[in-house]
Amino acid sequence: MKQNVASKGTLSAGRMRLRAAACAGLTAAVCFAGCVPAEAKVTQIVIDQRESPTYAGAAFGTVGQYEKFIGRAFGEIDPNDRRNAIIQDIQLAPRNANGKVAYVATFTLVKPLDMTKGNNILLYQVVNRGNRGQAFNIGGDPGDGFVQNGGYTLLWSGWQGDVALRPNHANETVQVPVAKNPDGSPVTGPVIFRFANEPAGTHTISLAVPPPGGFTGVVYQPLSLDTTKATLEKHAAESTTAVTGGVVPVPSNAWAWADCSVVPFPGTPDPTKICLKDGFDPSFLYQIVYTAKDPLVLGVGLAATRDVVSFFRHATQDDAGTANPVANHLSYVIGHGTSQSGNLLKTMIHLGFNEDEQGRIVFQGANPYIAARQTPTNFRFALPGGAATLFEPGSEPVLWWQDWPDKVRGRARAGMLDRCRDTDTCPKIVETFGATEFWDLRMSPGLVGTDAKHDIPLPHNVRRFYFPGTTHGGGAGGFPTATTPPSACTLQSNPNPEIDTQRALFVALTDWVVEGKRPPHSRYPRLDEGLLVRPTKAAMGFPTVPGLPFSDNFENPVLDYDLGPKFIYNDMSGIISNEPPTVQQVITTLVPRVNADGNEIGGVPSVQHQAPLGTYLGWNVMAAGFFKGQICAFTGGFVPFAKSAVDRVASHDPRPSLEERYGTQDGYNCAVRLAAKGAVAQRMLLQADADRLIPQAAASNVLPTTGSASDNRTAALLCSLERLSDQHGDHDSDDGDED
C-alpha cells in the first residue's frame, strides 16, 4: 500500500512553484540558445540505477512520490582557465586528448516524480567524508519528509578524492588524478601520521584506519620502505598546545613498513602499514613523519562539485545525448554542508568556485552549518577528512566573511567573499553553529579575528545564528532529566537540539533566495555586548557545581603553525614543507558567557534551553586513554538539575531545582509553551515543530502534576505569564534589517 507522508505546512512547494516555474523556462532558453558552451564541464552522465518511485512508494503531501537516480558524472577541467588555476598541482595533473584534466564523480539525485509539483529548487547537500546526510528531516531520509514535503530536488555528489567507494553506492566519491613531475617522476613531500590508544598486544596498524567519520582513506605511500628515511617516535604526554613530554624515538630497526599479523616481525612488506617489533603501548601516542609520493590533486573535487551542480541546474543533456533528468525544472540552488562539508562550502566560496565556467553563480544560497574552519583539501598531500586535531591545518586561511586584517599572524587583509565579489557570484548565506564549535572547533577567530579585540562586521548577504548550549550537530532533543554519557566521555550526553531552529532558518534562507524576503536579524554572542569572554571560570561567570569539572583554558586552541615558505596561508593552498610544523604562537580565543546555571547567554536558544532541565554544555571531558582529562572530541555534556530543593541542598548544588523553577508539570508545560510561542513569532521555530514539541514536553513527566502550595504557586505564575503573552502579543516578528 502506498504510504502518504502528510505535509504539515512547514514548507510550501506551491507558493514558490509558480514563480520558479516562470523563471525556469526563460533561464534555460536564454542559456542554451545564446551561451557559448563551456570548455570545462561535465561531458557525460551515466545512470547506473533508477528507483522509481523511491522511499518505498511514499507520497509527500501535494508533491507526491519521488524517484532516485544513482550514477557517475564524467568531467574535464581546463588547467589554464583562471577559475581552475588556484587548484594546487593542477599543472602537474595528467591531461586527456583534449588537453584537459579529467575526473569522475559519483552522484545521487532524488527528485519529485512529477517535477511540476516540485518547488524548482535544488538542495545540494555536500557529503561529509563521502557520507550522504539528510540535514533537515527528523528521523533520517525520508524520516518525517520535511524537505520532500517542500518539493525540493535533492543532490549529493563526491568531492573528496581520498575516499574509497563502498559497495552498493553506499557513499559518494570522486576520482581525481595523481600529480607527477614533468619527467614522469613522482612528486614527493613530507607527511605526518599520528595515532594513540592502540590496544595492548597490537603489532600492526594501518595508515588507512578510518579517521573520524568512518571512511577508509587513500594512504599516501612512502617513497621508500627504508625506515632510516622516516622518523617514528612515541610521546608519553602531550598538551593541546603541542607541549610534549616523555618523547622517545623508536629505533629504525625496531619497526618496519610491513604487516606482522601473519608473519612475525619484520613481517610482510606493506607501504600502507607499520609494524612495531615489541608492539604498541596504549599509554603512548605515536607519531611518524615520512617522505610520501604521488599526491592526489584533491582540489579537483572543488571544480567537480561546481561542475556537477551546474550541469543539473542548467544542462538539457550531456555530450552523448543523455538527458538531464531535471532539465528546465530548476531555478535556484541552495547548498548545505554540515561540519566538514560545511567547511567545504566555505572553501568553495573563498577560492572562487561559486562561479562556474560560464560565469554563472553556482549556489544562490548557502548554509554552512557547524562549520568553524575551512576544509584542508587544496594543498599538496592534503587530508580533508581530519577533525581539528594537533598539527592538522584548517584554521590557517581567512575565517571571516568581511575583509579584515590578520595582524597577529601578519597576513594580508582579506575575507572569504573577496573572489565572489569580484565576479558578482556571492550567495546569500545563513551561517549556523553551536557551542561545541567555540570549544572544540576554533570558531572564535571567525567572529572577532585573531586579536580577539573587535566584532568583525557581517556583509549584507550574510546572516549568522548561534545555538547556545549545544553539542556538535545538536542533541537528540526531547525533554529528558537524565541521559547516558557518550562513549569515552565523563559527563552525560547533551540532549539540547539544533534541528528545530535549523529547519526554521532553512525556510528563512529559502524565502530570502526565492522571494527576497529578509531573514531575521543575526543572533550570536558579540564582544560589544559582553557575551564573548576568555574561557576561564571567572570571565565566564561559571558556577561551582559538585561533580562538574571545569578547568580554565579548556578549549581546543587555535595554533599559528609555520608550515613552510611554499604554503599560501590565506588560501590554505600550496605546499607544506615543515612536518610537524613549529607552533609560533597560540591565538587568543573566546567563548560565550554563561548565566548562574552555567547555561550560555545569547544567540538563538532552543525551547529546551529556554525551559532548561539542567546545564547544557558545548564541551565534555575525556574519561580515559591517552587524552584523559582533555576535551572530549566534538561532544557536549549535560548536568541535570536536582529534582527538589531537598535534593539540591543535600548535593550542595547552587542551581535551583526543577520544583523551585517550575513547581509542577503544568508549570513546566507553560514554560515550554511560552518559549515555543516566542520562537515561532521570531521565525526561529516553525509552527509545525512547536506543535510537536509542546505535547512532547507535556508527556515528559519532568515533575508531578500536583505539588506543595509553594510548587502550585510557582506553576500558576508561569502559566499566568504564558496567558499574558497571548493577550499582549509580546513576541514581535523579527524580519531582519541588515540589508
What is the predicted function of each stretch?
Residues M1-L18:
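N-terminal secretory signal peptides that target proteins for export/translocation
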